[in-house]
Each structure stands twice: as C-alpha cells, then as structure tokens.
C-alpha cells in the first residue's frame, strides 16, 4: 500500500506542478482505477473496492494556502453529531500519513437511487419552501448564480421523508452555525438509497464568487 500511495501522490503532484492533466487517463488505465479531482481533493476509485481514497490537494500552496479539506470534513462530521444530523453525512476516516500526505477513506456512493423517486411531490415542495431556501440563502455564499448551486428536489424530499422536519431545522442550524457553504448537486449522492452529502468541508479558496465571510 505504501508503494502504491507514493506512486499515486507523485503522479498527481506532477500534474499539479505542470498544470497538465492530459495524462490522467493513461494513469487510470495503468492502475485500473478512476481518478477524480476538484478544487480541494483527489479521489481515487477502484471498481472492486467498496470505499474510495481521498487525498488533500495542496496545489493551492502556489497561492500561499495549504488547507486540509479532508480534516475539515472529519471535524465537521464530529460537530454534526452534536446537532444529531450526522445521518445525512457520509463519514470520512483518516487512515494514516504517507510521504507527508494525509490519506483518508470514505464509503463508495452512487449518484442514482431507486426509492426516492417514489416520494410525493407534495412533500418535496413543502420541504423546499420551508428549508431549502433558508439553507442556501444563509450558507451557500459561493457561486449563487451557478446552475449547479442547488440540490435536487428528489434528494431533499427523501431527506424529509426519512428524518422529518425537525431534522431539517437542525441541519439548517448546523450549516449556519459552522458557516458551511458550497452545498450543491455535485456534493450529494446516495448510499443504498439513503441520501448522503459526500463533501461537507465547505470552500475557503480563491475565486471571484467566493464569499469573504468564509
């Protein structure tokens, strides 16, 4: 595992160094895996594994930052327990440090479901009016005009159906209290038809649309 982690980190760091990700597909083919990369982390997925590997992406250091978003996410999960809303968060676990890089794992999720689509549209609409707007107006603060800066009604309706209105209120308070932003469709998914948020670290980076309050 150590040798594998070192090879992965070396490759990904090199892509960041030269700003060239054209070789990622060759890297994926050589290891028979899928590599995903966003603003803050790398995610490595193997088809035969039931979990994924997450590695903090430190290329932001060229702008003078070195934020470990995986650790922020783990901290946010522990805080969520105090609000009793951790059921909707997909846990992330620190497994060790390899070559000065902290490595985390998270259960593999899906982007689709089979049960949630059966939920009534009335419930989804009721939830949207009472909770959806409050969460985004108070906590998003990032790319408010972007089309992906919203959460699917079916997903939110399933949350309401499973956990109820009080849960939604607690979750809204949780996001506001910790200043959790960057909640949108790209950061949600499903685990055995259970709605989950897979990225709940927020975003404190650079960009014209990020809020200075975060």
Indicate residue ranges for each PLM-predicted region:
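Juxta-kinase regulatory segment immediately upstream of eukaryotic protein kinase catalytic domains
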Residues: 1-33
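Short Pro/Gly-enriched beta-strand edge/turn motifs at strand-loop
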Residues: 21-30, 165-175
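ATP-binding glycine-rich loop module of kinase domains
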Residues: 31-86
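Conserved hydrophobic "DFG−1" position in protein kinase catalytic cores
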Residues: 45, 55, 105-108, 190
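Generic beta-strand structural signal
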Residues: 45-46, 97, 144, 183, ...
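Protein kinase-like catalytic core scaffold
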Residues: 51, 88, 104, 179, ...
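Conserved structural core of kinase catalytic domains
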Residues: 81-164
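Catalytic activation segment of kinase domains across protein kinase-like and atypical kinase folds
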Residues: 176-214
């Amino acid at each position: 595992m150590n040798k594998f982690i070192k090879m992965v980190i070396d490759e990904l760091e090199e892509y960041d160094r030269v700003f060239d990700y054209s070789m990622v597909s060759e890297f994926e083919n050589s290891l028979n895996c899928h590599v995903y990369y966003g603003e803050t982390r790398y995610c490595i997925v193997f088809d035969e594994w039931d979990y994924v590997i997450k590695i903090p992406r430190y290329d932001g250091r060229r702008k003078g930052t070195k934020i470990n978003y995986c650790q922020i996410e783990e901290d946010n999960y522990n805080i969520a327990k105090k609000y009793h809303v951790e059921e909707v968060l997909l846990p992330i676990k620190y497994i060790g440090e390899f070559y000065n890089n902290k490595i985390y794992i998270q259960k593999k999720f899906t982007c689709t479901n089979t049960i949630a689509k059966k939920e009534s549209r009335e419930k989804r609409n009721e939830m949207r009016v009472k909770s959806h707007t409050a969460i985004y107006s108070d906590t998003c603060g990032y790319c408010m005009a972007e089309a992906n800066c919203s959460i699917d009604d079916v997903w939110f309706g399933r949350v309401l159906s499973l956990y109820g209105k009080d849960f939604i209120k607690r979750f809204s308070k949780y996001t506001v209290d910790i200043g959790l932003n960057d909640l949108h469709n790209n950061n949600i998914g499903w685990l055995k038809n259970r709605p989950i948020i897979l990225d709940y670290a927020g975003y404190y980076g650079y960009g014209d649309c990020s809020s200075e309050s975060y």
